[in-house]
C-alpha cells in the first residue's frame, strides 16, 4: 500500500531534521552536506505524505460523524472534498516516488544511421536529423556535429551529434530504435511508395568517473581520411579507429585534420557506447526497469513509422497515431509524440509503485 511506502520516508525526513540541528553534524561539513542533500531529495515526498496522512485522518473522523443528526450532512459534503483531494494527492505522490533516472539531465550523443532502402534511407537520416535540430532549437539546446558521412543525394549514411542542454536525455531517450519511412522518392516516375529504415541511438554523455577504460583493452589504428568516391582528403594518417577488444565495439573518426582531435572524439563516443551497453545489460537484469521502459531502446526494435502519402506518424510502442507528419517534422514539433511517451513511461512506473 502507498501508506506503507510513505511512512519510512517521513520517518527518515524527520530524523534528518533532528540530526541537522545537532552539534556533531553542524561541526562536520561532509556529513552536513550529505544529510542536507538527502533531506532535499525527499522533502517534496515527505511534505506531501504528511498532508496525505492528515487527509486520511480527516476522512476517518468525518465517516464517524455520518450518523450524527446535526453534523452528518456537513460531514458528507466534507468527505467529497477530502476524497477528491486524496485522489489528486495520491497521483502527485506516485509521480514523486518514481525513481529518478540519473542520466535525465545529461547531454546526449545522437547517432543516426541509414539502414535498408539505399539512397532514400540516407535522405531520411538527413530529414530526421533536421527535425531533431529544430526541436533542439525550440528547447534552447545546442547541437554539435561530431561526425558525418554524406551520401551522393543530399542525405547521410551516418551522422553523430552531441546535443547539449538541460534534460536532453530525459526528452530524447525514447528515440532509440528503428524508424521506418514510407514515401514516394523524387526519382520514382511510377508513383510507387518505397519503404526504407534508419536506426537511431541515444547515448548519454559520460565522464571518466562514470566509465573507466583500461588502455590495454584498446586497439588503435590510424589511416588516411577518405572522401567521397574514395579520394584522399589529406596525405597524413589523421583518421583513427579505436576498438574496445573485450566487447568488439569500434569507433572510427576522420572529420578532423588532426589525428589527436579524431582520437579524442572517437574515445568520447566509444565511452558513450560502452556506457549505453552497460545500461542495456543492467536493464535486462532488472525486472522493474523492463516494466517501466517504453520499448527496449534496442536499435533493432521498430518503434515508429512515418507514412508521407497519408501524412501519418505512428509510434508502435504506445499505439499513437498522428496525422500531422509534415507539420511535426518541418516544425520540429516532436513533443507531439515525446510527451505521450514520457506520460506512458510514468504511468507504467506508477503502476509498479502500486504493486
UniProtKB/Swiss-Prot annotation:
GO terms for molecular function: translation release factor activity, codon specific. GO terms for cellular component: cytoplasm. It is found in: Cytoplasm. Residues 283-303 are annotated as: Disordered. Transmembrane segments: none annotated. The modification N5-methylglutamine is found at residue 231. Keywords: Cytoplasm, Methylation, Protein biosynthesis. The keyword Cytoplasm applies. SMART domains: PCRF. Disulfide bonds: none annotated. Signal peptide: none annotated. SUPFAM superfamilies: Release factor. Its main location: cytoplasm. It comes from the Bacteria. Belongs to the prokaryotic/mitochondrial release factor family. Peptide chain release factor 1 directs the termination of translation in response to the peptide chain termination codons UAG and UAA. This is Peptide chain release factor 1. The gene is prfA.
Amino acid at each position: 500500500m502507498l501508506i506503507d511506502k510513505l511512512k519510512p520516508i517521513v520517518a527518515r525526513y524527520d530524523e534528518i531534521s533532528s540530526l541537522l540541528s545537532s552539534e556533531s553534524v553542524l561541526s562536520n561539513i561532509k556529513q552536513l552536506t550529505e544529510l542536507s542533500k538527502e533531506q532535499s531529495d525527499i522533502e517534496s515526498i515527505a511534505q506531501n505524505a504528511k498532508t496525505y496522512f492528515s487527509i486520511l485522518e480527516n476522512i476517518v473522523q468525518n465517516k464517524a460523524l455520518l450518523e450524527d443528526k446535526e453534523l452528518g450532512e456537513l460531514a458528507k459534503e466534507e468527505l467529497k472534498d477530502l476524497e477528491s483531494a486524496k485522489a489528486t494527492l495520491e497521483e502527485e505522490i506516485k509521480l514523486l516516488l518514481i525513481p529518478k533516472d540519473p542520466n535525465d539531465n545529461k547531454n546526449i550523443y545522437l547517432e543516426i544511421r541509414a539502414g535498408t532502402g539505399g539512397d532514400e534511407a540516407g535522405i531520411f537520416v538527413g530529414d530526421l536529423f533536421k527535425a531533431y535540430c529544430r526541436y533542439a532549437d525550440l528547447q534552447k539546446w545546442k547541437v554539435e556535429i561530431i561526425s558525418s558521412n554524406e551520401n551522393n543525394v543530399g542525405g547521410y549514411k551516418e551522422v553523430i551529434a552531441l546535443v547539449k542542454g538541460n534534460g536532453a536525455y530525459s526528452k530524447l531517450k525514447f528515440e532509440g530504435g528503428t524508424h521506418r519511412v514510407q514515401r514516394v522518392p523524387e526519382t520514382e516516375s511510377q508513383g510507387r511508395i518505397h519503404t526504407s529504415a534508419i536506426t537511431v541511438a541515444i547515448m548519454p554523455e559520460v565522464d571518466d568517473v562514470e566509465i573507466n577504460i583500461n588502455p590495454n583493452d584498446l586497439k588503435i589504428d590510424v589511416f588516411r581520411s577518405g572522401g567521397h568516391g574514395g579520394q584522399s582528403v589529406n596525405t597524413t594518417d589523421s583518421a583513427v579507429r579505436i576498438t574496445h577488444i573485450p566487447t568488439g565495439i569500434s569507433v572510427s573518426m576522420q572529420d578532423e585534420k588532426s589525428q589527436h582531435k579524431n582520437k579524442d572524439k572517437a574515445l568520447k563516443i566509444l565511452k558513450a557506447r560502452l556506457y549505453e551497453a552497460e545500461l542495456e545489460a543492467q536493464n535486462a537484469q532488472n525486472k522493474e526497469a523492463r516494466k517501466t521502459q517504453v520499448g527496449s531502446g534496442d536499435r533493432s526494435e521498430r518503434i515508429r513509422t512515418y507514412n508521407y502519402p497519408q501524412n501519418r506518424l505512428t509510434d508502435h510502442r504506445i499505439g499513437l497515431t498522428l496525422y500531422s507528419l509534415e507539420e511535426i517534422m518541418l516544425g520540429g514539433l516532436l513533443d507531439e509524440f515525446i510527451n505521450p511517451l514520457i506520460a506512458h513511461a510514468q504511468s507504467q512506473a506508477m503502476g509498479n509503485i502500486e504493486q
